Amino acid sequence: MAPMGIRLSPLGVAVFCLLGLGVLYHLYSGFLAGRFSLFGLGGEPGGGAAGPAAAADGGTVDLREMLAVSVLAAVRGGDEVRRVRESNVLHEKSKGKTREGAEDKMTSGDVLSNRKMFYLLKTAFPSVQINTEEHVDAADQEVILWDHKIPEDILKEVTTPKEVPAESVTVWIDPLDATQEYTEDLRKYVTTMVCVAVNGKPMLGVIHKPFSEYTAWAMVDGGSNVKARSSYNEKTPRIVVSRSHSGMVKQVALQTFGNQTTIIPAGGAGYKVLALLDVPDKSQEKADLYIHVTYIKKWDICAGNAILKALGGHMTTLSGEEISYTGSDGIEGGLLASIRMNHQALVRKLPDLEKTGHK
């Protein structure tokens, strides 16, 4: 028998050649794409600056957008805080003791507010560091979307985007400030807060009061929806202090400023900062100074620090040191906050409080 062979018609030869050319084209184009990606060229995700390169270094974020999301997060968290309080089912429990021996309480309001605030911010800005007072369950992957709308009051004050490297940003969330007062149904002291720090410096802050629905915000070198009062009493100031150690501050304050000084015990660091400002909330007390003499967490004070700084005020340790919002989550040196006063002169007046603050 004659050996069998394979015969191809002219059409078959043409098809075979076309298939071969197609294989060679894809191999060659893939090779070129790989070579281009080494130099950051090419526009497809995963092949250039818009893909892995951007994800690796976090890119940039717009502080104006972060302010808009921070306001929304504080309000959304506040909705949860108010809903739980009005249900009167708090599921209150203790996380342990504070350094002063008081119960460090947590409620459903804290947890649910934290969940809303954290995931709204994390979904909008996945590449930034977010520090929050309450635990975040790693298994909880809720996605809460932002509609990318910036409110008119923010656009009016912050007229242009403000881009910063994402890796320089740290967000501090307090999902429910004044939990002790919350459990006692002292609603006026309760706030939700968000702060954005850039390279450790507080740049924007939001303080929201869930029960009056008042929100204060400010951005350093940007704008604000709140302002300082027209005058402050520096000689015999009204001093707002923590309810838990008002007597400790009162003793030294009277020695420093005289017996005409008024001490205002209050709950919540957010409430105390608002006491220094022109706030159109009838439940808000007014003070000239805010003094704290014990250890305090940074999520309690960062938003207030940013707002005061944006308005020309100051918040420092009792020894006058600026507070860095990186690293550890608390400060040891007490706290002094003022606005439209000679802050360093006040620091020099309070040596005894500084010593007390380090005990």
Swiss-Prot record:
Catalytic activity entry: adenosine 3',5'-bisphosphate + H2O = AMP + phosphate
Pfam families: Inositol_P
Post-translational modifications: Contains N-linked glycan resistant to endoglycosydase H.
Key word Cell membrane present: no
Entry binding sites for Mg(2+) 2: D174, D177, D300
Binding site for Mg(2+) 1: E133, D174, L176
Lipid bilayer topology: Single-pass type II membrane protein
GO biological process, one term: phosphatidylinositol phosphate biosynthetic process
Recorded metabolic or biological pathway in which this protein acts: Sulfur metabolism
Active site positions: D110, T179
Matches recorded under Gene3D superfamilies: 3.40.190.80, Fructose-1,6-Bisphosphatase, subunit A, domain 1
Disulfide bonds: none
Sites bearing N-acetylmethionine, chain numbering: M1
Regulation: Strongly inhibited by lithium.
Subcellular location: Golgi apparatus; Golgi apparatus, trans-Golgi network membrane
Amino acids binding AMP: S242, H245, G268, K272
Keywords: Acetylation, Disease variant, Glycoprotein, Golgi apparatus, Hydrolase, Magnesium, Membrane, Metal-binding, Signal-anchor, Transmembrane, Transmembrane helix
InterPro entries for this protein: CysQ/Inositol_MonoPase, Inositol_monophosphatase-like, Inositol_monophosphatase_CS
EC number(s) from the headed UniProt entry: 3.1.3.7
Keyword Lipid metabolism included in the entry's annotation: no
Region listing for Disordered, in residue ranges: 86-106
Disease the record associates with this protein: Chondrodysplasia with joint dislocations, GPAPP type: A condition consisting of congenital joint dislocations, chondrodysplasia with short stature, micrognathia and cleft palate, and a distinctive face.
PANTHER family cross-referenced by the UniProt entry: 3'(2'),5'-BISPHOSPHATE NUCLEOTIDASE 1, GOLGI-RESIDENT ADENOSINE 3',5'-BISPHOSPHATE 3'-PHOSPHATASE
Function, in words: Exhibits 3'-nucleotidase activity toward adenosine 3',5'-bisphosphate (PAP), namely hydrolyzes adenosine 3',5'-bisphosphate into adenosine 5'-monophosphate (AMP) and a phosphate. May play a role in the formation of skeletal elements derived through endochondral ossification, possibly by clearing adenosine 3',5'-bisphosphate produced by Golgi sulfotransferases during glycosaminoglycan sulfation. Has no activity toward 3'-phosphoadenosine 5'-phosphosulfate (PAPS) or inositol phosphate (IP) substrates including I(1)P, I(1,4)P2, I(1,3,4)P3, I(1,4,5)P3 and I(1,3,4,5)P4.
Family the entry assigns: Belongs to the inositol monophosphatase superfamily.
Name recorded for this polypeptide: Golgi-resident adenosine 3',5'-bisphosphate 3'-phosphatase
Record lineage: Eukaryota, Metazoa, Chordata, Craniata, Vertebrata
GN (gene name): BPNT2
